[in-house]
A protein has these predicted regions:
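Class I SAM-binding transferase module
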Residues: 205-206, 211, 215-219, 224-245, ...
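Class I SAM-dependent transferase core
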Residues: 62-104, 144, 435, 439
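S-adenosyl-L-methionine
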Residues: 134-171
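Conserved SAM-binding loop of SAM-dependent methyltransferases across substrates and taxa
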Residues: 117-128
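Short beta-strand element of Class I
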Residues: 110, 129-134
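Mobile active-site "lid"/loop adjacent to the S-adenosyl-L-methionine
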Residues: 128, 139, 174, 178-216, ...
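Polybasic, low-complexity RNA-engagement segments
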Residues: 1-53, 280-445
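Conserved class I S-adenosyl-L-methionine
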Residues: 106-116
Length: 445
């Protein structure tokens, strides 16, 4: 089937008075938007910090996502120390729309079925819910793990399962599910200046995949809980027609609670579609109620240790070395022969039921002599809680450090842990460094 102009296709769907406005928006860069990492810093504190720097933010329809209307620093947003320190991350407004519709809560187990590169997983984990972040493709999964590690989200685990198999392997297991489905991404051509065309055959092929993913999500979701479906495209085949197929096939099993198509000229964001389903009954089509979750082989970790003794030892060490006394109650430390990691107690109930690919954030390497050596993610996980072996930086020092520079410091700064220091800005954890003579060696990655 031949490719046709995407803009010509959209023109058939819009009122005449909106066509020109849409075409104009499509050919322009979107305004920069950022999401505040609220599990690290309250939004009001972040606004105060950047306001003092001369930034001008404008509230979007999301409470923790802002347009950046004025940015006064010489560094780019991505190079800024507040980004390197994960006070915020850069996320298009449209990409932030779907995750909040799940209304994630701390005690819930949520599946992000098509998770890479990880922005929506981070949004969901930022609420305190435990997120199973799935990506079957290895290169994309590596990027997903990298982003989760950078943002220190300990309440996450990564799986590498074909999304269409979740319903069969884990029937009625998850409280809520996000299906941010692979799509034609017709709206995304503005990013690369690529050809603005559409391929009907490709779109229909993707729609069949999207339907399979949604069917799997329906089977894997508990009764009376939510499923959110989203795409970054605007055509009907991947959006309204997919939704229609699901609601007709699963009548009495799911109800469509909400759906919206975000258009750039109306909503000041990228093109996006989102739909919210409520599962109201078991799926009699696939007989989910007769399935049972089989015991999974736990992730094999050499010399794995989660003993009560280890929990006490690590907590005592963190208290003695960093004066960290308010460790979250759901924290779970575990060790191997070479490292010590942190996750949450959700792991205790999940590891035998799910085939997990990754479920930890590293805190320390363990030397041959048994000595604990802090690793970079320690600062972001516990930096806000530490008051010993810490050093407060200025904005200028923080930016220099974000640019991978070593910092010259006062020689009389003392540490009690092999010259390691947790760096802070405005009393929030920023980075980890090692003092060598009069310099802080840069360990930002």
């Amino acid at each position: 089937m031949p490719k046709i102009s995407y803009l010509d296709h959209i023109a058939k769907l819009l009122p005449d008075q909106e066509v020109e406005a849409f075409q104009s928006c499509y050919l322009q860069k979107l305004p920069k938007t950022i999401k505040v990492v609220t599990s690290k810093i309250p939004t009001k504190d972040f606004i105060k910090i950047v306001g003092d720097m001369g930034w001008e933010l404008e509230q979007t329809i999301q409470s923790d996502v802002f347009y950046v209307r004025k940015f006064t620093d010489s560094a780019t947003l991505g190079q800024h120390f507040l980004h390197q320190g994960w006070f915020f991350y850069i996320q298009e407004l449209s990409a932030s729309m779907s995750a909040p519709l799940l209304d994630a809560q701390r005690w819930e187990i949520i599946l992000d079925m098509c998770a890479a590169p990880g922005g929506k997983t981070i949004q969901l984990a930022d609420t305190g819910a435990f997120v199973i972040s799935n990506e079957p493709l290895n290169p994309r999964r590596k990027a997903l793990i990298y982003n989760i590690n950078r943002t220190w989200m300990i309440n996450t685990a990564v799986t590498n399962i074909d999304g269409s198999r979740f319903g069969q392997e884990y029937p009625e297991f998850f409280d809520k599910i996000l299906v941010d489905a692979p799509c034609s991404g017709e709206w995304m051509s503005y990013k690369t200046g690529g050809p603005i065309s559409r391929n009907e055959w490709l779109i229909k092929s993707l729609a069949r995949i999207q339907i399979k993913l949604l069917e799997s999500a329906i089977d894997a979701c508990k009764v009376w809980w939510k499923i959110v479906y989203s795409t970054c495209t605007l055509n009907e085949i991947e959006n309204e027609e997919v939704i229609s197929t699901i609601t007709e096939k699963y009548k009495g099993v799911v109800e469509l609670e909400f759906n919206k198509k975000y258009r750039p000229h109306r909503d000041h964001c990228g093109g996006f579609f989102v739909a919210v389903f409520r599962k109201t009954d078991r799926d009699v089509i696939n007989h989910v109620s007769t399935n049972k979750i089989t015991q999974k082989i736990p992730l094999k970790i050499p010399d794995f240790n989660i003993s009560d003794k280890l929990q006490s030892q690590v907590k005592l060490y963190l208290t003695e070395q960093f004066d960290v006394s308010k460790i979250p109650s759901n924290s779970l430390f575990y060790s191997t022969i070479n490292s010590i990691y942190l996750t949450t107690t959700d792991y205790l109930t999940l590891h035998s039921k799910l085939s997990l690919d990754k479920v930890w954030i590293p805190l320390f390497d363990v030397g041959r002599d048994g000595k604990r050596i802090p690793v970079h993610s320690l600062w972001n996980i516990l930096g806000n809680l530490a008051s010993k072996n810490v050093l407060e930086l200025s904005d200028q020092q923080s930016q220099a450090y974000a640019e991978k520079k070593d910092l010259k410091i006062t020689p009389n700064i003392q540490t009690t842990i092999d010259n390691f220091l947790l760096l802070k800005r405005k009393n929030y954890g920023f980075s980890l460094s090692k003092k060598v003579g009069d310099f802080l060696k840069n360990k930002l990655s």
